[in-house]
Amino acid sequence: MFCPECGTWNRSSAATCSRCNAQLPDVSKSPEKPDEEITNLRHVTGSRYCVQKRLGGGGMASVYLAEHAHLERPVVLKVLHGHLAKDPEMLERFRREARAASQLVHPNIVPILDAGEADGVLYTVMPYMPGGSFSDRIGAGAQPPVEVASIVAQAAAALDYAHRRGIVHRDVKPDNVLFDEDGHALVTDFGIAEARFHGRLTASGRAMGTPHYMSPEQAMGKLVDGRADIYSLGIVMYEGLVGFPPFDGPDAFAVGYKQVHEVPVSPVQVNSEIPAALAEIVMRCLSKPPADRYARGNDLADALIAWIASTGETGNAMRDAWTARRATPTGAR
């Protein structure tokens, strides 16, 4: 559990915080008016997980902090919203995440530890990432170029690994890049990923993904391959460097239209202090024709690592990027 005073994580059996000695709540007791979804989740998971609190959520699912009762390690439970669990299409989309992610074993991909389904409640279990998301960091403002390059290089290597196994993520965005306790970047949420041989993935004719990070071909509902994820990584990199994505609009259609038809302003034109060579890498990722982008995630990772090296950086940024790249040897499956 997390200390309500200082935020330090403690085992569920602890009575006081290991850091500040504050009294910790007894998580074995349910709150007087528990959230209905938490109540259902506790019923479904039984004694296996100690569900502690809601961390947040999106349009598809709610995310809860829990502790594995036997291993005493913090985990995250992602629970499909109840009304969506009744929709066969969304139900299959949620199940797809567990199936897709279970095939992926890479140090820069958040693994699925477990999954369950009972009484209309569907959930997946993942390790808790205490470092937050890239979105959290960007929320504080534009990030240092070397850090952005390292984070995207790690994500690119992880996605290359997935692509070589026939899986395209399709929803790469800052929210889906998380950090572990050591600051390593991990890609998560393969919720709309699908093996290439299954063909296009649309819902009732709609393009799937997040408009601000969606490739042109995805916005048009076309078949996509790994280069769609490269485009999305370009937008993630752009946002990390300047603090906002290249395209915005009053609605999803307007943003999607710009993804297809408009050329983004170079990051250098937004902030002249951004290195031109790094901006060129970003703009290549954002090429409208997929053939003009980096062909593979490893190609992008290599370009970013070379750029980091050119700055003279030899610290954690270079180490983390290079470690991720070595975990994804070219040609390996």
What residue ranges belong to the model's regions?
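Juxtacatalytic C-terminal regulatory tail of Ser/Thr protein kinases
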Residues: P25-I38, A291, A295-R333
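Protein kinase glycine-rich loop
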Residues: Q52-G58, V63
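C-terminal lobe helix-coil module of Hanks-type protein kinase domains
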Residues: E67, L159, L178, T210-N316
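AlphaC helix of the eukaryotic protein kinase fold
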Residues: H81-Q103
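Activation-segment/catalytic-loop signature of the eukaryotic protein kinase fold
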Residues: A115
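Conserved short submotifs of the Hanks-type protein kinase catalytic core
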Residues: D119-S133, R137
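Activation segment signature within eukaryotic-like protein kinase domains
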Residues: I151-V152
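Protein kinase catalytic-loop region centered on the HRD/HxD motif
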Residues: A157-I167
